[in-house]
Regions:
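Phosphate-end processing signature that detects enzymes handling 5′-triphosphorylated RNA
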Residues: 1-195
């Protein structure tokens, strides 16, 4: 099983600009994501996220499942078709439940379009990725601004990543973002997001 450990913070364009200048060395990635669910919303109900994301034109299909604390299950495969990706995700070790739920049919429900600026941060015994995301959430024929910071553990102890993220949050007065991009985009689809 893949495991993802990350911390997210809401931000403003001004804060992103300051961090970009102070840290330097960022590389841009153009991201366009489509999130999928069953017609009954079963994946969302089970807090599972199924997406197809184009990262600088490369298609990556991902399943995320609930986990403990700030971690969660994550499986990714290179594929440009979500239906073809499901058996590949199963081969990669994702829960068989995906196959059962998706057998009833899946549909696109919401999405995102944003630019991600990434930079590696060397930490004691490991490495984190600092990501600055700016763009839009899409859903229900509406758009809402997206501006956030992610700190993801890439290797080494999660505690080192958490400590770096906490220092970053304190330095720039960042507020933790409890909801995923998917959750905010699906709320927008349902008319529950006020931007």
């Amino acid at each position: 099983m893949g495991r993802e450990f990350e911390l997210k913070y809401g931000a403003t364009p001004d804060i992103l600009a300051v961090i970009r200048t102070e840290f330097g060395g960022f590389s841009p990635i153009s991201m366009e994501t489509t999130y999928f669910d069953t017609h009954s919303g079963a994946l969302s109900t089970k807090r599972m996220t199924l997406r197809l994301r184009k990262e600088n034109g490369t298609a990556v299909c991902t399943l995320k499942t609930p986990g403990d604390d700030l971690g969660r299950g994550e499986w990714e495969v290179l594929c440009d078709d979500i239906q073809k990706a499901i058996p590949l995700l199963l081969e990669a070790g994702c829960p068989e439940e995906l196959n059962t739920l998706a057998a009833t049919g899946i549909k696109p429900v919401c999405g995102t379009r944003f630019t991600r600026l990434i930079r590696d941060i060397l930490l004691p015994g490991g490495r984190a990725e600092l990501a600055l995301d700016q763009g839009v959430l899409t859903g229900g024929g509406r758009e809402a601004p997206l501006c956030e910071i992610e700190v993801e553990c890439k290797e080494g102890p999660e505690a080192a990543t958490a400590a770096f993220a906490q220092k970053l949050a304190a330095r720039y007065n960042l507020i933790p973002e409890e909801r995923s991009k998917f959750r905010r985009a699906i709320d927008l689809t349902r008319g529950e997001e006020n931007g």
